[in-house]
Amino acid sequence: MTKAIMLQGTGSDVGKTVLVAGLCRLFANRGVRVRPFKPQNMSNNAAVAEDGGEIGRAQWLQSLAARVPSSVHMNPVLLKPQSETGSQIIVQGKVWGHAKGRDYQALKPQLLGAVLESFATMRAGTDLVIVEGAGSPAEINLRQGDIANMGFATRANVPVVLVGDIDRGGVIASLVGTYHILPEEDRRMIRGYIINKFRGDVSLFGTGIEAIGGFTGWPCHGIVPWLKAAGRLPPEDSVVLERLARGSDGALKIAVPVLPRIANFDDFDPLRAEPDVDLVFVRAGERLPADAGLVILPGSKSTIGDLMDLRAQGWDRDITAHVRRGGRVIGICGGYQMLGRMVHDPLGIEGSVTETPGLGLLDVETEMAPEKTVRNSTALSTEYDAPLSGYEIHLGVTRGKDCDRPSTVIDGRPDGARSGDGLIMGTYLHGLFCSDAYRAKLLASFGLSGERMDYRASVETALDEIATELEAVLDPAWLDSLAG
């Protein structure tokens, strides 16, 4: 019989995603057939699953950790926040609808069937499913109709382990407070807890374990230290961008403006990992650095809205000055659309603004259309004759004279555009910097000739290191009970 366990948190960003990924790799290394599952995720960081639809990139990473093909059933409900139109709702990989926050609460019961169907699909033919909750089960104002935490756990009869983040402080109060605020029906689902992100001498927390046990009766399944290897994994949420280093001593400075609805920002992770690259995420209120050699406009869930915000920050003037100095610009997906002369949205897909001027750096125009392109792709860089692999997730069609100079050829068809002087490039392909050969040639064009890392291998190594650390600190009897 397939076993299942669910990790829920005392709050957001307590480390559930990394723990699920680490446990998936731990059990995969033991020969256990394991799969990840997250009933509901909210993120503009999406991936294209191998069966052809959208899921959160966190679940894609967890499938990599489990050494199984990714599937839309690993994340049956994905909410992608937009601008004034609320969130786009993806169900089992496909666009299901749009809703604002209050409206979505009323829609959740309609989605429970799809969630349970996907969970049954994930359980079939496997030994263990590791489920990740969202936010905190203690948000009792959202409990009615819940499909992300205890609402799912009680319906699917999946036991829960609570994760508390000691690094942010107040972990005892968070765990004990969750116990007291939950109704008895939900409390009965919890089988223990894990303390995450611990720094220092674990023995000093002994009285803390006694206190938590005294208040709740829950056993502690382990105290997990701060996992340094987690920093080498692609980040899941844009909130992580606030904590990333604001640059290093790398020879090439690359500037990325952090747009309000930035999407798929893990595109930049391979560049961040290169020691001779100084990757700077530019926040609201900051100027784009004048000494940057390259500016990259990221993907966006709301191209027109983010383009208007980019102008409000004055970044359009910074980018124009950058190009006049001979600087280069790359636009990815929504960032590519922003580089053109105009962005049209006659159907109001993104909102009430039906068109806005682009930055005018490429002689192209984009028209939003309801059909969404979602696919994994192999490609070739026309500029560097380098192989690429990545994925496309976008609305809209881009046309214009500069498309006669495509930046890439994706599955045999031209994609993207380049300016006549070669300074400006746009593409719809996400993940291009993960391709080691392309990244090496791009950096070499800036005079960086150092040996390049194998990015995929570095992620695999990080997952193995996390699995090894978890095996050393988590309760062996608890792990064995899940493996057996």
UniProtKB/Swiss-Prot annotation:
Annotated keywords: Cobalamin biosynthesis, Glutamine amidotransferase
State the superkingdom.
Bacteria
InterPro entries registered for this protein in UniProt: Class_I_gatase-like (IPR029062), CobQ/CobB/MinD/ParA_Nub-bd_dom (IPR002586), CobQ_GATase1 (IPR033949), CobQ_N (IPR047045), CobQ_synth (IPR004459), GATase_3 (IPR011698), P-loop_NTPase (IPR027417)
Gene3D superfamilies assigned: 3.40.50.880, P-loop containing nucleotide triphosphate hydrolases
Q: Does the keyword Nucleus apply?
A: no
Which residue intervals define the domain GATase cobBQ-type in the entry? 251-438
Q: Does the keyword Nucleus apply?
A: no
Q: Which Pfam families match?
A: CbiA (PF01656), GATase_3 (PF07685)
Gene Ontology MF: a single term:
ABC-type vitamin B12 transporter activity
GO biological-process terms attached to the record: cobalamin biosynthetic process
Please name the PANTHER family in this protein's record: COBYRIC ACID SYNTHASE, DETHIOBIOTIN SYNTHETASE
Q: What does this protein do?
A: Catalyzes amidations at positions B, D, E, and G on adenosylcobyrinic A,C-diamide. NH(2) groups are provided by glutamine, and one molecule of ATP is hydrogenolyzed for each amidation.
Name under which the protein is recorded: Cobyric acid synthase
Origin species: Rhizobium rhizogenes (strain K84 / ATCC BAA-868)
Gene symbol? Answer: cobQ
